[in-house]
Amino acid sequence: MTKALLKDLNARDAPLREQLEQEATSLPKIVLSERQFCDVELILNGGFSPLDGFMNQKDYLNVVENLRLSTGEVFPIPITLDLNESQADSLKAGDRVALLDPRDGQTVIAILTVEDKYTPDKANEAEKVFGANDRAHPAVDYLFGRAGNVYVGGKLQAVTPIRHFDFVEYRYSPAQLRSDFQRNNWNRVVAFQTRNPMHRAHRELTVRAAKQHGARVLIHPVVGMTKPGDIDHFTRVRVYEAILQRYPKGSAKLSLLPLAMRMAGPREALWHAIIRKNYGASHFIIGRDHAGPGKNSQGEDFYGPYDAQYLVEQYAQEIGITIVPFQMMTYLPDEDIYKPVDKVEPGTRTLNISGTELRRRLRVGANIPEWFSYPEVVAILRQSYPPKYSQGFVLAVPATSDKLLPSALVSALNEDGRRHVTLLPRLDAISVFYAQELQRAGAAVVVSLADADASVKVPAEWTTVNIKPKDSVSEVTFAVLSQLSDEGYL
């Protein structure tokens, strides 16, 4: 299987860096959004090859309608520089614009040469790319709620290499990963995409796929933008580090992908396959509901469970990667093994723990069995997501005629003895900061809203104590302790 042509703009433009840096000082500047920043990184390092810039209108329309660039190459997701009208008004074809790193708003990471600007039909984009014009889809919500109304197309030149400061040892570019595979004679590599922690089922699935195809495993998780509510990438990477030790020595490698996901189901799966081909993989695992965003506004799945497999198989030979389709893995307790559900005989006893149930067990501190996940993985998840009784909380006490109520709550909680409690006597910007830091550290905090700074709002995640006009201090205190106990904080 031939290697995909890699457009590594970082390598191409390295000799021009000093000249481009000097030019950028006099150019108009745009601070990228988080998603644009992820897109630029993968354009510059070749992860989005054959792209070498943001799509012009011709490419955009062809991708939306036909899953191809205007030159014919398969590419299923529009990669566009969306701007608001005030940003785009002054731009015209031929202009040069410096694109800035959003983390500091100063570092020039690329220069864009404007080719065109155009107003997209967002409703059509939503229907064609994401399958529905439904704000319950996170990418559709982004499209209408956050993305600018003008798209600017044009080619990029790399200026300052993008630096990351976490898990640097796993941040390989496509060229670096290809070189590593070649150096270690990894001629067959099966890539595994994930935005979630990995458990035993994922390990069994990837090992099985590698054995079937005589390949090594590339664990290639997304650490850019994922689905809102996903577990943070810091926790996930620690999990991947731990589970990597459970693979046969020399059979698996971890590399992080700075991708901004769109959760576009079948189209996204095809996009992921192209990206993995660019990173040097020969095979790509596509499982059940690949890159699905969950339920639509009618409570139904946006995509069928295996739609992604069907679509990618149609293009696999053309893009040059072998698809490894897998159904969900399930545990057979009587045999102590995992099998794909389609390989399980009718009537066989099986066990599984859903993501919802896992989150519940973490929340209440319930047992997570070893058949489901490795102890070291569970320990990492519990550290990042402790049960309610180990989490901090903040009680905001409204002004009342009895100014002793905040002190009474502190005394009652301290008497209970299960939590460390701090009283902050006034709401202002400084006390909000202290309360949030104490909460993060697992402490209980009581904040009096008497004499509150009117310019400071009570954070939404705080619990405001409900006080009825005739309630006594003891009645309020009892009600608060009962509520905290019912919610699992005590």
Swiss-Prot record:
Record-linked InterPro entries: ATP-Sase_PUA-like_dom, P-loop_NTPase, PUA-like_sf, Rossmann-like_a/b/a_fold, Sulf_adenylyltr_euk, Sulf_AdTrans/APS_kinase, Sulfurylase_cat_dom, Sulphate_adenylyltransferase
Predominant location: cytoplasm
Annotated site location: Induces change in substrate recognition on ATP binding: F326
UniProt region (N-terminal), positions on chain: 1-165
MF terms in GO: ATP binding; sulfate adenylyltransferase (ATP) activity
Class in the EC hierarchy, top level: transferase
Localisation per UniProt entry: Cytoplasm
Keyword Ribosomal protein (UniProt): no
NCBIfam families: sopT
Similarity comment: Belongs to the sulfate adenylyltransferase family.
Name recorded for this polypeptide: Sulfate adenylyltransferase
Species: Schizosaccharomyces pombe (strain 972 / ATCC 24843)
Lineage of the organism: Eukaryota, Fungi, Dikarya, Ascomycota, Taphrinomycotina
